[in-house]
């Protein structure tokens, strides 16, 4: 039976995409709010808890000795919420729309010394809980710790046994939710003997207030602790300063390079006119620089299958990154929604697999590749295999520690199904179209059978120096923005400056292209025609600088600790650097290829 001709088979292939679309929870740009009447019950879900400085080290809230129902009922979650480590469950809190609660008992508890020690350890590690009300996350600390360094030394630990919920509404919708511990004192957990029990009474209160804000997205998150709105001016000044430096650098490189190149073309073409009567074998006599290697500059490189796979996957991630930023600019990612970006990234990755297959197969056929099936397999494996290995290690560590970040088996099967039934087939389909639409490689100069000997190169034209220059300059263009992104991904902040992000992303690609052209010109001027892989490695090394920055961020800009958070941070930071290597290596290669074709087309030759 042929899959292509079977409508039912095609529907099975697109079924996971529909699941992903439904898994985002709501349509693009639509806020997931519920309409209430006065007195309607408002369900509060408990979610996860974990160290404040380790956002990816999360555990279920009911793993702590806290008030919980006799039978725990879990909320049905979307794919993005599961990937975000959410494990929502119903709680004992009774909240009704627009009905204030002065003080209500949640439960009475008798804690053993072991349970008290568990709470003490959680408070010492600054455990930070998350509840969810009407799809709005509300967060707070489990307890309070006071450390005194003066004599006599004191170390006090207390548990918050009363929570005050503040909810704002507009009409029949909840706009904002928050939790605080105002006007209460923590219950001391100190001085308990091993054979003693500690009696606790958990209480809560609810305050409702009306607001004129009509949409949740208009509610400034900076009002409850975010640092981005308060430092927006400094943020903009830093970005503008970085852009000015980048524009000066790009302008300097472009002007100098164009003047030198114009002089080279004029000199070479003049020499060609004076020696036009000479034979083809004498064409190179008296020449030097990039003209003399015109018969070798388009000589195909080794490992062409791997090169084409890098270009294909790099093009895919360029499309994926652009798509995510554009969707964010269009308001499709509400900051209050859980896992929306995760779901969108998986959906776009599966759909853009056709781009990697097309670009890789198209260029592979152009440069004379014959092992088409191997090229497709290499293209599909170039990112998926490193990602799977990294995820396996990270997920195993989470599973061993009982973290909610460990994916359930059903989610793993769903993701595997998406890749097998959507991602891989689209890669093959894109490869077929790319192979069939490929024309012969358009080389302005013929290539001789015998390769020219490359003269010794000075140290400043080595691959390492090119990688250092080509990686550092693009990295410097995004270094300021990188801090804010890291503070969002690996911290407790929220990033909403998508316009700046789009602009910086465009600057990054532009700088990478300009630097690649400059470095390729300097390489060809030294009569070194091995530019194919060099162009990929030079600017692609920006990914290495990003990984080195992640090491610096972990050591000097964050308070992350522990095996769970450390393994996840460095595992996915290494993967992020690899993705940037693929993206910028692709931009660098095609920029150099376009430049080389331009200069040799404009060179007069017999």
From Swiss-Prot:
Q: Which domain of life is it from?
A: Eukaryota
Keyword NAD set for record: no
> Biological process (GO) annotations?
autophagy; protein localization to membrane
Key word Signal present: yes
- As given in the record, the signal peptide range reads 1-27
| TM segment ranges | 237-257, 310-330, 339-359, 373-393, 412-432, 469-489, 499-519, 535-555, 570-590
* Glycosylation sites recorded in the entry for this protein: 178, 401, 559
Membrane topology designation: Multi-pass membrane protein
Gene Ontology, cellular component aspect: autophagosome membrane; cytoplasmic vesicle; lysosomal membrane; membrane
* Keywords of this entry: Autophagy, Cytoplasmic vesicle, Glycoprotein, Lysosome, Membrane, Signal, Transmembrane, Transmembrane helix
Official protein name in the record:
Transmembrane 9 superfamily member 1
Q: Which organism is it from?
A: Homo sapiens
Its gene name is TM9SF1
